């Protein structure tokens, strides 16, 4: 399926955020917070020097972070660790409930199909840009990684007819499915978020589950996906990254403007949802919760949603 949209790879634009996530996972693996042995070699394969140094520990948080700043490399690593634990547990809970079909939307450098202990008979579909999946497939082959589920790559842009591409790979909408939208929704325009959730709903049998990361900052403003407060939190961090040779503006990559609340939207369509603030995930992992000194909202106020289809 050929897309007419702008494309990117794992070293540029939105694709670089997938490499950033893997770098954070690699760093968190060294502390025992998570276990992703594929994260570091995948980051190395992409070849962004800054991200490789982050992943390996050659670049310490103290080298980059600004004392007293709300967010820095250490806080970003903690966020990604807590987020990874949440989605790992989500898939584990779904498997325990008997779900044997899973879909990872915008999978990037996600290696759950190779590192999680999936029950026998589980089919895992990974959806992402063709170049991204081709790169990851080659890298995992070079690493001699063995899948722990039946992994099926669905190479399609989420702005195109991805449900058709998913069905073409053998997806069965009559079976309960575990869906994940990790680090995805803030990058979608508000109307595209609704279309994605509608498509997931139409493809989901009773008992299906969806886990999603929901960014509250910027959801009701025109100040970028992070909102004015979120951008203010991250700008010192991103400025230091630029000094070390890596230039990425997370606010520019997302989509701002009023959008429907994910939990409310899903519940109106037959799902029952539970939200967990990022702050609670950090606290449960024994990690510091970053809070601005002036008490304004921050990234810690974003939430994670798990919804079950009735």
Curated annotation (Swiss-Prot):
It comes from the Bacteria. One of its GO terms (molecular function) is methyltransferase activity. SUPFAM superfamilies: S-adenosyl-L-methionine-dependent methyltransferases. Pfam families: LCM (PF04072). Gene3D superfamilies: Vaccinia Virus protein VP39. Belongs to the UPF0677 family. The lineage of its organism: Bacteria, Bacillati, Actinomycetota, Actinomycetes, Mycobacteriales. This is Putative S-adenosyl-L-methionine-dependent methyltransferase MSMEG_1888/MSMEI_1848. It comes from Mycolicibacterium smegmatis (strain ATCC 700084 / mc(2)155). GO terms for biological process: methylation.
């Amino acid at each position: 399926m050929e897309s007419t949209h702008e494309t990117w790879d794992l070293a540029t634009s939105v694709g670089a955020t997938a490499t950033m996530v893997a770098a954070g996972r690699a760093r968190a693996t060294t502390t025992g917070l998570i276990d992703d042995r594929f994260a570091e070699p995948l980051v190395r394969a992409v070849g962004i020097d800054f991200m490789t140094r982050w992943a390996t520990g050659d670049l310490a948080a103290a080298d980059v972070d600004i004392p007293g700043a709300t967010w820095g490399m250490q806080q970003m690593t903690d966020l990604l660790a807590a987020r990874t634990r949440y989605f790992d547990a989500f898939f584990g809970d779904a498997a325990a409930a008997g779900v044997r079909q899973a879909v990872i939307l915008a999978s990037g450098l996600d290696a759950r199909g190779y590192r999680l202990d999936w029950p026998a008979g589980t089919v895992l579909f990974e959806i992402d840009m063709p170049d991204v999946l081709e790169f990851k497939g080659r890298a995992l082959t070079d690493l001699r990684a063995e899948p722990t589920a039946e992994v099926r790559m669905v190479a399609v842009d989420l702005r195109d007819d991805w449900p058709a591409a998913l069905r073409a790979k053998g997806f069965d909408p009559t079976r309960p499915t575990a869906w994940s939208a990790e680090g995805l929704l803030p990058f979608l325009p508000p109307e595209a978020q609704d279309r994605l959730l509608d498509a997931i709903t139409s493809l989901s049998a009773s008992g299906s589950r969806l886990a999603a990361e929901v960014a509250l900052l910027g959801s009701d403003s025109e100040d970028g996906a992070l909102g004015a407060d979120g951008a203010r939190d991250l700008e010192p961090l991103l400025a230091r990254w630029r000094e070390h040779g890596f230039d990425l503006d997370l606010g520019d990559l997302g989509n701002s403007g009023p959008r429907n609340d994910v939990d409310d939207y899903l519940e109106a369509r037959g799902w029952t949802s539970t939200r967990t603030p990022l702050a609670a995930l950090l606290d449960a992992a024994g990690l510091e919760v970053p809070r601005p000194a002036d008490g304004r909202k921050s990234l810690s106020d974003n939430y994670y949603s798990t919804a079950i289809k009735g």
